[in-house]
Design a protein with these regions (language model features):
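Mature-chain termini and adjacent capping regions
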Residues: 1-178
Length: 178
């Protein structure tokens, strides 16, 4: 195995290296692990473009940060713009909600998350599904990812569970207003 420390906090592990530093790239041979602070990515063969400060892979991967996970077909880590891009089959999940989209990006300095293409956001409480062509959100340290649509139409459905025996009577419930 090959292990390298990039900058002061990015640890790179691979089974082997191929490439040409004069041409400015190294291929990290699978399995590949990129670990930085609280984030961890497990991937297949990944190209490290030294001049562009980019890691790219077309292989399926899984990433984890605190309680959130991300999977997709390929990724681009652009150190210059502090952005991770999942170009295909993006799936983000955290306790209580999950999001799927054709493409996603996350800026780890601003914590801005953008999902594009057939976006579906599912929440467990309440049982809610929201669909939109694009959603944007913030990755918050205590509240997880909060998504919204930027001025575009969305379609949501919410399912309510019927009252269970022994639950509050209708007269003792708080009124609902919109």
């Amino acid at each position: 195995p090959v292990r390298a420390l990039r900058n002061k906090d990015l640890e790179v592990t691979a089974s082997a290296l191929k490439g040409n530093t004069q041409k400015g790239f190294l291929d990290l041979i699978q399995p590949v692990r990129l670990k930085q602070n609280e984030a961890d990515i497990n991937a297949g063969t990944t190209r490290w473009n030294l001049a562009d400060q980019r890691f790219t892979s077309s292989a399926r991967f899984q990433g984890k940060r605190q309680d959130a996970t991300a999977t997709g077909n390929g990724f681009v880590i652009d150190e210059a713009t502090t952005t991770v891009i999942i170009p295909k089959a993006c799936r983000l999940s955290q306790p209580g909600e999950s999001l799927t989209a054709r493409r996603c990006s996350w800026n780890w300095l601003t914590n801005r998350v953008v999902a594009d293409g057939d976006v579906v956001l599912r929440r467990r409480e309440p049982d809610q599904e929201t669909r939109a062509p694009r959603m944007e959100g913030q990755l918050g340290s205590s509240e997880g990812v909060r998504f919204g649509s930027s001025g575009q139409r969305v379609r949501s459905s919410i399912r309510f569970t019927p009252d269970q025996p022994g639950s509050a009577t209708p007269s003792s419930r708080s009124p609902v207003s919109f």
